[in-house]
Regions:
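Flexible, small/polar- and glycine-enriched "cap/hinge" segments at structural transition points
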Residues: 106-109, 114-116, 139, 170
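Outer-membrane beta-barrel transmembrane domain signature
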Residues: 116-130
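Residue-level signature of outer-membrane beta-barrel architecture
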Residues: 18-20, 94-96, 137-139, 150, ...
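Membrane-embedded beta-strand positions of outer-membrane beta-barrel proteins
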Residues: 30-32, 92, 109-113, 135, ...
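C-terminal outer-membrane beta-barrel translocator/porin domains of Gram-negative envelope proteins
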Residues: 1-102, 106, 119-121, 157, ...
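Short Gly/Pro-enriched loop/turn and capping motifs at secondary-structure junctions
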Residues: 99, 116-120, 142, 152-153
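Outer-membrane beta-barrel "beta-signal"
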Residues: 135-139, 160-171
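Membrane-interface anchoring segments and C-terminal beta-barrel signals
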Residues: 127-144, 148-149, 154
């Protein structure tokens, strides 16, 4: 392999988020991300710098990091994700207070539509999509999110994971 000191590559990443509040505490949220990376000259791209997409924080309804290029592992009989040098992710989420919760804004329901994928050297822009529902709670320990995602465009090799849990921020 190539010693780490000889690896030369670049990464470009951008993210855009927009939130719009409506009456009665309803919020429409958008998240968009793109990333691209490439090695210089004849140097190989370090696979440890690959992007991964799938799961909460990217495309819910799929297992974390499972989308994009894969290889078939003959030892386990499963497809393993390899990540990719480019990624695209888009999330649209509509959040409402839980009916009957009154002034308590810590518990909220949301619906979402997600799309995205990662790519190797060939970018073909085939996206995976999902939609679903979830519950978020601003707990004393921080934000918690539970979501149930349903893939729209999945392949037999995709690792589907419908129920997911997240600790942390909105996207």
């Amino acid at each position: 392999g190539t010693p780490a000191g000889n690896m030369t590559f670049y990464r470009v990443y951008g993210q855009y988020q927009k939130y719009h509040s409506f009456s009665k505490g309803n919020i429409l949220s958008f998240n968009g991300e793109v990333g691209y990376s490439q090695a210089y000259g004849n140097n190989p791209f370090p696979i440890t710098k690959n992007y991964y997409v799938g799961g909460i924080g990217s495309v819910r309804g799929y297992a974390p990091g499972s989308l994009g290029p894969t290889f078939y592992n003959t030892n386990t009989g499963t497809y393993q994700p390899t990540g990719g040098q480019s990624k695209i992710v888009s999330n649209l989420e509509y959040t409402v207070p839980v009916p009957g919760s009154g002034a308590d804004k810590t518990l909220r329901l949301f619906g979402f539509v997600d799309g995205g994928n990662v790519y190797g050297q060939n970018i073909n822009l085939v996206l995976r999509y999902s939609y679903g529902l979830g519950l978020s709670w601003i707990s004393p320990l921080g934000p918690l999110k539970f979501s149930y995602g349903i893939p729209i465009r999945s392949l037999p090799t995709d690792n589907v994971q419908r129920l997911q849990f997240q600790v942390g921020t909105a996207f």
